[in-house]
Every structure is written in structure tokens, then in C-alpha cells.
């Protein structure tokens, strides 16, 4: 039996509503299922956050979750999203496999 693959999704969120973020995320998850039949998606969309949470708080929490991932998946637009860029640097520096939305074109 194949091993479960833990996937962290790095997704630009600035300027998007919670609904837009969740819709994009659900679409990506459905596409990932064809590449990873035994995938566990690490939930990194924070719904219950401190009311005064700053962007760096979210990034810190995301990096903690990312440490559990086998693969970090980068949604389109990650190159211009500050948090996604930092997550990308962390994945590369710490040897976590990366995958990009353009990889799902097939």
C-alpha cells in the first residue's frame, strides 16, 4: 500500500475574500487528487485567528505547518506574494519537495 503524501498549499491570499480563497483551494485539492490518490492536505487556511493577527503571525503559523509536509504546492501568483516567496525559500532550503500549479496542466 502506498504511503500517504502530506501536501501544504502555498496560496496568495492578499486582496481575496475568504470565499475566493476557499474556492481556489478546493479546486486545487480536486486537481491534486489525480496526482496524489493518497494525499492529506494540511489545512493552512486560518479561520479562527487572533483579531489583531498581523501578516507575520500568519506566516509563522504557515511555516510551522509546512514543516510537516512531504510536498509544498505553489498556486499561480506565488512569485509575487511575499509570504509565498518566503515559503518557497523555506521549502528549497529545507529540502521539501515542491510542485507548481503549471505542473497540473496535464
Predicted features, each with a name:
Residues 1-106:
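Conserved catalytic or regulatory cores that recognize and/or transform ribose-phosphate-containing ligands
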